[in-house]
Amino acid sequence: MEERILSESAHAEDQEEWSLRPQTLDQYIGQEKAKGNLSVFIQAAKIRQETLDHVLLYGPPGLGKTTLATIIANEMGVGIKTTAGPAIERPGDLAAILSSLEPGDVLFIDEIHRLSRSIEEILYPAMEDYCLDIVIGQGELARSVRIDLPPFTLVGATTRAGMLSAPLRDRFGVTLKLEYYTMPELAAIVTRTSRLFGFEADRMAAEAIALRSRGTPRVANRLLRRVRDFAQVAHQTAIDATLATGALDRLHVDALGLDDVDHRLLRSLAERFAGGPVGLETIAATIGEDAQTIEDVYEPYLLQQGFLQRTPRGRVLTPFARRHLGLKEGN
């Protein structure tokens, strides 16, 4: 699958913009419910002079879970170590990470749903009792050794909370769901980032980018970088609505944040299957994509915005999607 500019998953260049990320809760735009509760939990932990309880962050990709983990460490005044579920392959990998933590540190595990069950079982006593049980030797000579760990906060992030085992999920004292961002919130993020870039976007330009950002800050900042490219080549030192919309049109990102892949998927439903219902595997074969990719990457936004419906018999194109594509009912 080619890398899409509208993909909520991280691109290599997204990691290069670490300096643009907010460092405190006050700087963090959006997610007011989660942010408000998290602020209370952090303040209470600091008053008690305790480590913050373990935190599970879940929601679609690109909404700021990694940023929030860093902010938690900053607000608590502690260090942070970052890893990902797929990177922890053996018990020794996890033991090495846990043993390197300083008192109060944050351990951030992205894609925590991808931890193996054997790794999870080692994590349970670490989360509950701040200790590590490891087996030394083999066969009759094997013995269990308990290693004490300093108090720490595990922050887990996942796009699939339902894939976490119940024992692991239950060990998180704080669970926060991150929602898609509103247009005003995304416009505020675009405005902030554009100032950091030194290419300030005016209000209408920020809103034009925000409308096409699929409710996701990561996409908003990526689109802004591309619009900035057009501004620099045009020898402009600021971004106005005309330049922004022109650049986004050239990138084939329409006014509601759909790109060519989205249009191809929706049009195939309309033109080849009379709007459905049609099964996921059939759609995948028609547009030449993997069914899992469609379900995980393309569908969430189309469903959330009301372009598609899921029914027991398959996917159905909505009247809203027909109007957006300029199709008459029955086409």
Curated annotation (Swiss-Prot):
NCBIfam families: PRK00080.1, ruvB. The RuvA-RuvB-RuvC complex processes Holliday junction (HJ) DNA during genetic recombination and DNA repair, while the RuvA-RuvB complex plays an important role in the rescue of blocked DNA replication forks via replication fork reversal (RFR). RuvA specifically binds to HJ cruciform DNA, conferring on it an open structure. The RuvB hexamer acts as an ATP-dependent pump, pulling dsDNA into and through the RuvAB complex. RuvB forms 2 homohexamers on either side of HJ DNA bound by 1 or 2 RuvA tetramers; 4 subunits per hexamer contact DNA at a time. GO terms for molecular function: ATP binding; ATP hydrolysis activity; four-way junction DNA binding; four-way junction helicase activity. It is an enzyme of class 3 (hydrolase). It catalyses: ATP + H2O = ADP + phosphate + H(+). This is Holliday junction branch migration complex subunit RuvB. DNA binds at residues 310, 315. The keyword Nucleotide-binding applies. Residues 255-331 are annotated as: Head domain (RuvB-H). Its EC number is 3.6.4.-. GO terms for biological process: DNA recombination; DNA repair. HAMAP family: DNA_HJ_migration_RuvB. It comes from the Bacteria. Keywords: ATP-binding, Cytoplasm, DNA damage, DNA recombination, DNA repair, DNA-binding, Hydrolase, Nucleotide-binding. Has 3 domains, the large (RuvB-L) and small ATPase (RuvB-S) domains and the C-terminal head (RuvB-H) domain. The head domain binds DNA, while the ATPase domains jointly bind ATP, ADP or are empty depending on the state of the subunit in the translocation cycle. During a single DNA translocation step the structure of each domain remains the same, but their relative positions change. One of its GO terms (cellular component) is Holliday junction resolvase complex. Homohexamer. Forms an RuvA(8)-RuvB(12)-Holliday junction (HJ) complex. HJ DNA is sandwiched between 2 RuvA tetramers; dsDNA enters through RuvA and exits via RuvB. An RuvB hexamer assembles on each DNA strand where it exits the tetramer. Each RuvB hexamer is contacted by two RuvA subunits (via domain III) on 2 adjacent RuvB subunits; this complex drives branch migration. In the full resolvosome a probable DNA-RuvA(4)-RuvB(12)-RuvC(2) complex forms which resolves the HJ. Belongs to the RuvB family. Its main location: cytoplasm.
